[in-house]
Amino acid sequence: MRRNSIHKQGLYLGSVPERAAVANGATPLTLDHDLDVLPGAGRRLTVAELAGHVEDLAGRISAAGVKAGEHVVVHKAANFDVWLLATAVARTGAVPVMLSHTLDGPTLAALMERLDKPHLLTDGPKLEALAGLPLAELTRSVISVGGSAPGVVSLAELAGSPGVRPRLQGLDEPAMITHTSGTTGIPKLVVHTPRTMRARLRPQLVLLALMRKRETVAIHIAFGHSRMFAAMALCLTKGMPVLLVNRGAPEDVAEFFLKHRPGLIEALPNSFLAWENLADDPRKPFASVKYFSSTFDAIHPRTVRRLLGASARRAQFFQIYGQSEVGPAVGRPYYRWSAHRMDGRCVGYPLPGSARVRLVSQNGKRPSAQNPGLIDARWDGIAKTYHGEQERYDANVHDGWWRTGDVGYRSKFGCLHMLDREIDMIPGVGSSLEIEDLVLDKLEELVELVVVLGPDSRGVPIVCTHGDEPLDLGRWRTAVAAYPQLADPIQIPLAELPRTATMKTRRVELSRRLEEKLLRQG
């Protein structure tokens, strides 16, 4: 068996573009933005050109002093070159560490301390933003995608460096590090290996095999997210044309999709939520879409119905539930004819070749809607460890099962219902996520609704409206009449909602801000 087979043995990120170029070199990739690291490359590439750019950048990174086995933090502005640089780092045999551009300075410093002097690969604006950090103490070297500066190595000045052949780790050695969302504090550093990353492709390969024709795939995911690397590996391997979306504003997305007409869109739930109103756009930007795919978090039923209705094809909406440490765990499709019956808490059934899932009682009684159990997962796709926090990782492992931190139950038909994060449960409220689904269904003017724990232990609805228009309190009271346990709503501008790099609402942070606001008023 070939050690670098990405399906049967392991997913080796640094060799994916080169291998794909051999089989599908002419397949196009189209971007809605320019690459920071290669501004002259243009917005339309072939897979063969992509592979050449990865080899070129790997040579430059090696010339900058990066060695196999070392950590290289990739922390720069959102751009497809984040994926490109990480893949080039992996080709050198070093370990790319994907730290989101949304992380603040203190958090970034804390994570780099945990990594013990990594290289930092960044850009000019980020270097200016990090001016207050002791980078000389925190890092082995600082490498910039742009111009040079004192103490900074410029990749631009290393153009023409000799290329490097892919250097492959062992199947169970660290190959990439990403981080958790950090909704409860400093993020954890999640270690992925070639074996765990390869395992996560299995269920998705089965789903892709069901597609009758090769579709153009539009991807709008944080470029440093673990899901992005899986999605790109699948698209490149299968020779599927790719549209890479960085500009996520609805009007920008509409224009890009109208021009290039994707057949499959992969995006995060809150991105689809932000695009909902495009369903009513007379230009019909979703008309060509056969498949919508949303991963990791549950998606609101209203969003699914509206997007399916916006397609001119017999569209399907695939919801896949999982997390950074687990990968895809369960999933299910929705269709236009069945979406009106969608229960937003039913996140899916076991996927072929994917994780096993169990429910663990919290009190000795059978898990149910009224008595949710702890959701555990088990398979070979679970991340290897938390870098620098093995004890914290081990605390989540119970008899070989990974404790996800979510609570839920199984229906009589076997569908896993995810009701809440354990840490976000509010006494006397039931499922906050279920309330959010049902109220969003009734109030189309809401673009986001988050129920968080208030200072008096009541559930406080935080609402955001389209265009930040004032909330109609009469319509609100009618919509929440079945939930007398809720406090009065607090409306904030959507831009003030604290989010992670993957657009998750940071509920703990939102609750903290709410408490501070009420204390100031009180």
Over which residues does each language-model region extend?
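Gly/Ser/Thr-rich phosphate-binding loop
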Residues: 263-266, 278-342
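AMP-binding/adenylate-forming catalytic core of the ANL superfamily
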Residues: 265, 379, 384-385, 405-485, ...
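Conserved AMP-binding/adenylate-forming
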Residues: 41, 58-103, 219-222
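Conserved pre-ATP/AMP-binding loop-to-beta segment of ANL
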Residues: 10, 25-29, 160-179, 185-186, ...
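N-lobe entry segment of adenylate-forming
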Residues: 1-64, 473-477, 511-522
